[in-house]
């Protein structure tokens, strides 16, 4: 047996440098748990001059790292989609183990990688929710269960913004600026606030839970950029919080996948998850509900997950990457057939008969009201009507909102949030 496993590290940014630091600082406990010493032999970066003082070779020659016969595991922390995918294929072709934190690459290429890998280990614990061991939970801890559903706060940036809006009555714009100032949001935060990042993670988790090869364009994705303080006020009034959730549900003949802002009851454990923290609730048919909570991003939490994969590979606990021999054939539930309760916000003319018109359209679409708030806008002839419904289907709700928008008394496009009870 080898006395040391050599790592080839691609990328020395926030996570890459944290991997190097932890491997050095915790080398004894890592060796005890892995049963072998683990160290970085070589790292590849774009600009060698920016990375000084490391006790291993640093170059910009990626091919030499792949070809180095002394390197046992390649760890990819470079970002992007196609370049990391090409690196993964070349690494696996050399029968070297591959570890990645790259959720976008896995969202698009996870099944191709599993087919390429054959019996060569691939680790990707760090690709979803950083320091939370949700990948291992689905692959191993819950493997005796049918996963009935899971839902989670999968993006720390959006959760921080919504937490600020809920607790401090901040506008979306101000909460986003605050997140950027603190380093929680990128200068271009589109992937976070539009739900794309959470959707990438949802696809990876759905592959593990259900064995399906779903595509990004097939699932319902909505972001948080249309949420306003009025929505938060309604949520507080009726005992809800608003969170961006990734949701998966198993039906007898299909799988339901969606990412969108959701109103959830304050009794729900996920409603208590604030700031940049992540959490995922998983329901198995035998174990019941389990909850996984922790830091979803950041250098050291993500590096911790990367190193857990390296240790797993060192122990030679290789297994199927996605936990299924072959992709399962269950289709996705059509978006228009989704069933839940809804919240809507309307800007209307402040005049008699408007609410009667709204109620009539909802009734025509078999939608019944649950809670209603009406807010006058001072020094104007306008008002806001905020309401929630009982359970209905997506098609009926969208049809009703379209009809409401066509009313002369409705002054702007109606806004909608789904309720996840």
UniProtKB/Swiss-Prot annotation:
Binding annotation for NADP(+)? 15, 46, 103, 183, 186, 298
Q: Where is the ACT domain?
A: 343-418
Q: What positions does the entry give for NAD(+) binding? A: 15, 34, 44, 298
Q: Where does NADPH bind?
A: 15, 46, 103, 298
Which EC number(s) are documented for this chain?
Answer: 1.1.1.3
Q: What class of enzyme is it?
A: oxidoreductase
Which catalytic reaction applies to this protein?
Answer: L-homoserine + NADP(+) = L-aspartate 4-semialdehyde + NADPH + H(+); L-homoserine + NAD(+) = L-aspartate 4-semialdehyde + NADH + H(+)
Q: Which UniProt keywords apply?
A: Amino-acid biosynthesis, Metal-binding, Methionine biosynthesis, NAD, NADP, Oxidoreductase, Sodium, Threonine biosynthesis
Active-site annotation = 201 (proton donor)
Q: Which GO terms describe its molecular function?
A: homoserine dehydrogenase activity; metal ion binding; NAD+ binding; NADP binding
Q: Which family does it belong to?
A: Belongs to the homoserine dehydrogenase family.
Protein's recorded name: Homoserine dehydrogenase
Annotated organism of origin: Helicobacter pylori (strain ATCC 700392 / 26695) (Campylobacter pylori)
């Amino acid at each position: 047996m080898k006395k040391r496993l050599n790592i080839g590290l691609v990328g020395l940014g926030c996570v890459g440098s944290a991997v190097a630091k932890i491997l050095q600082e915790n080398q004894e406990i890592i060796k005890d748990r892995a049963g072998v010493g683990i160290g970085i032999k070589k790292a590849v970066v774009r600009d060698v001059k920016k990375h000084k003082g490391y006790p291993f070779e640093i170059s910009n020659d990626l091919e030499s790292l792949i070809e180095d016969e002394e390197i046992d595991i390649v760890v990819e922390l470079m970002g992007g989609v196609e370049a990391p995918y090409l690196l993964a294929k070349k690494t696996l072709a050399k029968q070297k183990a591959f570890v990645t934190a790259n959720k976008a690459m896995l969202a698009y290429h996870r099944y191709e990688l599993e087919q390429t890998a054959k019996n060569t280990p691939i680790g990707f614990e760090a690709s979803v929710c950083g320091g939370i061991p949700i990948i291992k939970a689905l692959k191993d801890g819950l493997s005796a269960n049918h996963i009935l559903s899971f839902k989670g706060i999968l993006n720390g940036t959006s959760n921080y913004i919504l937490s600020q809006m809920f607790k401090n009555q901040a506008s979306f714009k101000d909460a986003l600026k605050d997140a950027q100032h603190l380093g929680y949001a990128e200068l271009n935060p589109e992937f976070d606030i539009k739900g794309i990042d959470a959707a990438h993670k949802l696809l990876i988790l759905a592959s593990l839970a259900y064995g399906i090869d779903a595509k990004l364009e097939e699932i319902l994705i909505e972001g948080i950029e249309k949420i306003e303080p009025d929505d938060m006020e309604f949520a507080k009034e009726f005992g809800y919080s608003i969170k961006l959730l990734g949701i998966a549900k198993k039906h007898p003949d299909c799988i339901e996948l969606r990412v969108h802002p959701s109103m959830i009851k304050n009794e729900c454990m996920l409603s208590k998850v604030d700031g940049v923290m992540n959490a995922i609730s998983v329901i198995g048919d035998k174990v019941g509900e389990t909850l996984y909570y922790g830091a979803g991003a950041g250098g050291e939490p993500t590096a911790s997950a990367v190193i857990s994969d390296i240790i797993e590979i060192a122990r030679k606990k290789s297994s199927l990457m996605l936990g299924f021999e072959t992709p399962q054939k269950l289709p996705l539930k059509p978006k228009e057939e989704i069933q839940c309760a809804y919240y809507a916000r309307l800007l209307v003319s402040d005049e008699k008969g408007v609410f009667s018109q709204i109620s009539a359209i909802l009734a025509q679409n078999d939608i019944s009201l649950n809670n209603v708030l009406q807010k006058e806008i001072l020094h104007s002839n306008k008002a806001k009507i905020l309401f929630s419904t009982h359970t209905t289907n997506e098609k009926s709700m969208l049809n009703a909102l379209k009809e409401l928008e066509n009313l002369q008394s409705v002054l702007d496009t109606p806004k909608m949030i789904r309720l996840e009870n």
